[in-house]
Amino acid sequence: MTSKANDHPAWAAPYLAKLGFDDPESLGAPSLDTLRRLHRAHVELIAFENFDIQLGRPQGIDPAESIARILAGRGGYCFNLNNAFGELLTVLGYDVTVHRGQVNGSVATAKATADEYTTHMALTVVIDGERWSVDVGLANSHHEPIPLREGVHIQGPFRFELRPLPEIGPDAWRFFTDPAQTTFHSMDFTLAPATWEDFRSSHTELSTSPQSPFVRWFELFRRDAGCAEFVLDDEFTRDEGAGRRTTRILESAQELFKVATDVFHLDLSAIDDADRAALWDRIQRAGAEWRAKHESAEN
């Protein structure tokens, strides 16, 4: 659907409003400065979250549904967030490409070929002849776009790194998250173009398989200039880098949903009391099992 006021889709203005911007016409021509502002706003205001997967009713990942989620005050995981943001940037005139990526828990779990990259939808944007890594769906990583150049990239208190992977292919790269972070190790991606449809089967597996981390554990993330905030099961962490990290255990469903609303800017009014209680029971048990496992390993 296209707005009568201009040639932008009708969803573009309310999407931008969610990010704190006026209508598309007010942004002017695509620029690196505007891209940075849009990216920062997205990771600050639109959370990475898996509430629906945890409730056993995963949503689709097509662009229209992903955008509708954001307009309804929700977030999603990479397939939702990067799919929606890529669509927004495209209608705003940016040169956007979708790529296949793979999140690694460690180097040992990295795939041997780019054909095996299926678990992450990565984006790049070319501006003024330079390609940038754009990612609003990689948990507690990018706060703003990162130039696709080999080396270390500092964003606020966090240190990221990009390296080419010639052993995989001429278009393969590895993004390393901050060494002090524990949520994931790295993300490999290939610059070969992809489409959102390439991730359908991976989404089905990641959103329904009992072995999927998104089915096993509750996850909630946001970034801003000075910190990363996240909830893993019932533990709420604020990480300000350089060892400045505080974690507390949430005590109730009410506290979880208050944090999700007040800190992560989510509208969860569609989740009723029964589902909230069932979800909290699941999250609390998973958190207790995780702590018991790690306490046992340390003894």
Task: Annotate the PLM regions.
Residues 234-299:
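Extended, charged low-complexity segments
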Residues 2-19, 44-47, 102-254:
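His-Asp-centered catalytic microenvironments across diverse enzyme cores
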Residues 18, 91, 262-263:
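Residues at alpha-helix termini
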Residues 54-121:
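Active-site neighborhood of thiol-dependent amide/isopeptide-bond enzymes
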Residues 6-73:
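Secondary-structure boundary elements
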Residues 13, 36, 40, 80-91, ...:
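A broad, structural surface signal
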